[in-house]
Design a protein with these regions (language model features):
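Acidic donor-diphosphate engagement hotspot in glycosyltransferases and nucleotidyltransferases
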Residues: 46, 71, 95-99
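Short, acidic/glycine-rich phosphate-metal binding loop used to engage nucleotide
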Residues: 12, 59-67, 92
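Conserved donor NDP-sugar-binding/catalytic core segment of glycosyltransferases
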Residues: 92, 96-119
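Short beta-strand-to-loop acidic/aromatic patch adjacent to the donor-nucleotide binding site
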Residues: 81-92
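A conserved acidic beta->alpha catalytic loop
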Residues: 39-47, 91-92
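Short, well-formed alpha-helical segments that are part of the catalytic scaffolds
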Residues: 13-27
């Protein structure tokens, strides 16, 4: 399986939701080379919870946030990997193979990008 970096922008994810996200993340059969959380100065426990799973946490001011620029800032700090997966803090994995299924689509040489729908 190819290597990948997982980037997740966050803002006040909430303790219960964030714990649910990390619980589903830990069950994934394919784990990233690197998990990067980019947080827009959350005022709840978002960063504390995230820090138990990764030390790759970037904090920006809320005024710095924009969808593309925020993701690019996180990407600039990423280690080299075969792929990058961008998710949101509220995209809970539907099953333990979700990341593996996303990456498997790149076995088709005609596929350059993949996006999913939220359920």
């Amino acid at each position: 399986m190819p290597s990948f970096t997982l980037i997740v922008p966050t803002y006040n994810a909430g303790t219960a939701r964030w714990n649910e996200w990390f619980h589903a993340f830990q069950k994934q059969t394919n784990q990233p080379l690197q998990l990067i959380i980019i947080d827009s100065s959350s005022t709840d426990d978002t960063r504390n919870i995230a820090s138990t799973y990764t030390n790759n946490i970037i904090v920006i001011s809320p005024s710095e946030f924009n969808h593309g620029g925020t993701r690019n800032k996180a990407l600039a700090s990423a280690e080299e990997s075969d792929f990058v997966v961008f998710l949101t803090q509220d995209a809970i994995f539907e099953n333990k193979n979700a990341l593996e299924e996303i990456l498997s689509l790149f076995n088709d040489k005609n596929v350059a990008a993949v996006c999913g729908r939220q359920l």
